[in-house]
Structure formats: C-alpha cells, structure tokens
Curated annotation (Swiss-Prot):
It comes from Thermotoga petrophila (strain ATCC BAA-488 / DSM 13995 / JCM 10881 / RKU-1). InterPro entries: aa-tRNA-synth_II, aa-tRNA-synth_II/BPL/LPL, Anticodon-bd, Anticodon-bd_dom_sf, His-tRNA-ligase, HisRS-like_core, HisRS/HisZ, HisRS_anticodon. One of its GO terms (cellular component) is cytoplasm. This is Histidine--tRNA ligase. The lineage of its organism: Bacteria, Thermotogati, Thermotogota, Thermotogae, Thermotogales. Keywords: Aminoacyl-tRNA synthetase, ATP-binding, Cytoplasm, Ligase, Nucleotide-binding, Protein biosynthesis. Homodimer. Its EC number is 6.1.1.21. GO terms for biological process: histidyl-tRNA aminoacylation. CDD domains: HisRS-like_core, HisRS_anticodon.
Length: 420
C-alpha cells in the first residue's frame, strides 16, 4: 500500500523550508524585541472551549472543527485558532498574578475542515500574539504597529491594513437592530447561510462572500458606536496617523470569530487573489468572562504562514538560504574516515556546515553525491593524504583544488569558505 499525505496537508522540505524559517525567525525577533514572551499550548483542547469562545453559530464551530471523542468519552477538538487556548492557559495557570500588560506570542499548526485551495489548508500554520490587560487604544495601536513592523521586516510592501470598530456589547445592540431592519427588507434575496445568520448572528452577514454587494450599502457600525467606543476608535486612528501607518477604513469588516469587540482589522495582500487576507485580529474584552474568568481586556492578531509565504513569492522577495551541505568530507578507508570525522567536528566548531560521507562509496560516488546535495567544497582524505599529512580542498563549482597541511586545514578551510 502506498501511503499519502492527508488531503489539505503539506510536506515542507528543501528550499521551501527556508521560507518557513525566514517567517518564523523574523516573527520571533520582532516579538522578543517588543518584550513579548513565547507561549506554547496543546494542539487539542476541550471542544467546549471553542464553542464558547469562537461562537456556537460561527462557521468554524458549525462546519470546520476537527472534533472527536477520546477513550474517556470526552469531546476533544484540534485547535482551529490560537487565541482561546492562550486565554485558557492564562486563566488555568493564574498568570494574572503576574500583573496586567502581559504579552505572549505563539507559532504553530491549526486545523479546520475547509475546501483545500491555495493558501487555505486543513492543517495550516499561524504566528500570533496576544496583549492582555489594557483597554487603552494605545494597546490596539501597538498590535497594528507590530504587525506592520513584522510584515515590513519580511520585505513585504503590497498590502493594506483594513480597519473597523464593531463597538462594545452595549452599542452593538442598536447596530444589530439597524442591520435587522436593513437585511429584513431583502431577506428573500440572501443565500441560505445568510438567512440562517439573520436569526443567529446578523453581523456575520457583512462577512458573506456570496451576498457581499448588500453589505456595501448596509448600516455602518461606526455610526452606532457609544461615546466611549467612538473615542477609543478615533484615538486609535490618531495614533496610526501620527506614526504614518497606512490603513483603510472598511465598514463591512467584522471578522469570523464571535469574541471580537471594538477594534477589528485585517491585512490583505494584492498579489493573492480571492484568498488575500494574510493576517487579522482585534480586541476581545469579553472573552475572559465568557471562559469563566474575571473581566480582563485583551486583544491580539494571527497571521497565516502559508499565505505570508505566498505573498513573499508574489513580490519575488529573496530570502536567506543557508547551505547545510556547504562542505562535504570525502574519505577513503577506515583511518581516513576517523580523520575526516575529527576534521568535520573541528570545522563545525568554527560554525561551518559540514557533511561526512557514511555510505562507503568510491571517490567518484562521493563527489557525485556532494554535487547533488549542493555542496560548494569537498575535503578529500585517503591513505595517500594521510601519509603526506595533508587534505585536498576542492572547489566543486570551479574544479580547482589545493593541498592543505592537515595541521592548518581547519583554519585554512574556515577562512577560505568565509571569503565566498
């Protein structure tokens, strides 16, 4: 039987892995430079955690979660997003005892049963962070500023930040009523999902891809904000303008998770077609209470690694690729192998990537393999070289080679390689 990867998943290797390393390492550097700590949570949680946080009527809960019963009969779900697990960890481990203004970032796989397509997989990967404890618009500004910093550090430029405020639970009541009145007049024209959401979660009608043209003329949430939410939103825009972070106000933006309040935003890249959202986030001031904790203001963001990589490729951004087969040690015979291993150890201490042949191949076979793996240099050691106390350093691109005294080989090779 030939085993194949599950539909909606990917194997990542070769040159592709360096895109992942580039995104992940850039994200870590940006987060840690801003005082954000790493947190790691399990990839599966109690199903109820996501039902309560994401929303029972959301598409994620209704259609997309990977849910199963374990041997103890408990309902378990592979995490479809990263915020709820971080909040659960915060509450369970009493991290609030460390005080407010806490920041945590995460990197890892998420799971949703969706139709696989470019940039949308069933196992996908996210980078994200949460800022916990501040209700000030300064926190909202910091999140958006750091997202913008991260994307620019990657080299991306062809994206736009879409921004909206959907208000708090108090002012959103009037907004829902306005949407009910507007959509009630055209209910017969709406798709089946929108007809269902009309009764259960009317804000999600603004997010419908089928009936999006109706959303363009729908009432705007900003026109129904209470004084506090309006001040919060205006102050956020003031900060963004002061620091020249470009954004576009998008009054149809609500996001797909029910826990959002006030600020919501998305980052969309012009080179990705229909699936052009590469990051998004917002504020979720009520989520801690919903999950059994005290009232704690918080907000965060998540970015899809697969889509960010597509954006990097769309902009043809060159990424750093390390040659892990830079030097290939070719040995002929047992004594030569022992000396070759010792040489490799010494070169690795110098920070070089060094591979040693372990297949007992002939000289031609070892050199052929070194070429195939992309090695730049080969170090050749055989009985004759051992007798002379030398090694041969061959440049596999030019074919030039030089004999090097074994006693000085490590320093010579390290210096030679560093010049290229």
């Amino acid at each position: 039987m030939n085993y194949k990867r599950i539909k909606g998943t990917n194997d990542i290797f070769g040159e592709e892995i360096w895109y992942w390393r580039y995104v992940e390492e850039t994200f870590r550097n940006v987060c840690e430079s801003a005082g954000i700590e790493e947190i790691r949570t399990p990839i599966f949680e109690q199903t109820e955690l996501f039902v309560r946080s994401v929303g029972e009527e959301s598409d994620i809960v209704q259609k997309e979660m990977y849910t199963f019963q374990d041997k103890a009969g408990r309902s378990i779900t592979l995490r479809p997003e990263g915020t709820a697990p971080v909040v659960r960890a915060f509450l369970e481990n009493s991290l609030i005892d460390r005080g407010f203004q806490q920041r945590y970032y995460y990197i890892g796989p998420m799971f949703r049963y969706e139709k696989p397509q470019s940039g949308r997989l069933r196992q996908f990967h996210q980078v994200g962070f949460e800022i916990i404890g501040s209700e000030s618009p300064k926190a909202d500004f910091e999140v958006i500023m750091l997202v913008d910093t991260f994307l620019r550090k990657l080299g991306l430029t062809k994206y736009r930040i879409h921004l909206n405020s959907i208000g708090c639970s108090a002012c959103r009541k009037n907004y829902r009523e306005a949407l009910k009145e507007y959509y009630g007049q055209i209910l017969a024209n709406l798709c089946d999902d929108c007809k269902r959401r009309y009764e259960t979660n009317i804000l999600r009608l603004l997010d419908c891809k089928v009936d999006h043209e109706y959303a363009l003329n729908a009432p705007k949430s900003v026109d129904y904000l209470c004084d506090s939410c309006k001040t919060h939103y205006e102050k956020l825009k003031e900060y963004l303008n002061t620091f020249e972070i470009e954004y576009v106000e998008d009054h149809t933006l609500v996001r797909g998770l029910d826990y959002y309040t006030r600020t919501v935003f998305e980052v969309r890249h012009e080179g990705l077609g229909a699936q052009n959202t590469i990051a998004g986030g917002g504020r979720y001031d009520g989520l801690f209470v919903e999950l059994g904790g005290s009232s704690v203001p918080a907000l965060g963001f998540a970015g899809g690694i697969e889509r960010i990589i597509l954006a990097l490729k769309a902009e043809e951004i060159e990424i750093p690729i390390k040659n892990v087969h830079l030097v290939y040690v070719v040995t002929l015979g047992e004594k030569a192998f022992a000396d070759g291993v010792q040489l490799a150890v010494e070169l690795r201490k110098k920070g070089l990537s060094v591979d040693v042949d372990i297949m007992d191949r002939k000289l031609s076979g070892q050199l052929k393999h070194a070429h195939r793996m992309g090695s730049r240099y080969a170090v050749i050691i055989g009985d004759e070289e051992l007798e002379k106390g030398i090694v041969i350093l061959r440049d596999l691109e030019t074919g030039d080679q030089v004999e090097v005294d074994r006693d000085f080989a490590v320093d010579y090779i390290a210096e030679r390689v560093s010049k290229d």
